[in-house]
Amino acid sequence: TRIYWKKQVNVDFHTQDPDFDSYMKWVSFQPFLRRLFGCSFLPHHDYGRGGRGWRDLWQDCLSLLLMNPQNVGAMIEKNYGGVRIDGTNATIIGDGDGNFIADRNGIARVWMDHALWPLITTSLYINQTGDIEILKKQVPYFKDAQTMRGTEIDTLWNDAYGNKQRTEDGQVYTGSVLEHILIQQLAAF
């Protein structure tokens, strides 16, 4: 198992300070620990609840891109399933990749930086891998009662509807990753 974990962290650092090099190697290992154990190991960063949020997903992908970019594409694609059709996103990550929860306690939250993380992560992914085709991948939109960028409630929505945006005839609506990016970037204006 030691060999396995050493292969997972395949980034080396060489500075004048061996302690700093070791620390940076440890930081590179954090995304693996987060995926296994959640964020509870960083209580001073408000992760003490043990949950993972929107930023966590994308920042983990950024870190993993340094070590294993080929396997990050599927994660990025699933992450876009947390975007709502109004450009906002689910704030809490459920169990497993691509499973989202609107929020923890019924309070609508729209964060200014949430559209930034998918954009810069996808950009780095494309630059690292050359996989521009990811922009064409079809992904569903997240749906819950929040609408109009968290300022209104969709009174027609209920749990039976599910958490995917649907068309008028009840089919799950999908849009390309590029569409998701554009909606997130432009809907705030």
Residue ranges with predicted function:
Residues 64-72, 76-189:
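Aromatic-rich carbohydrate-recognition surfaces in CAZymes
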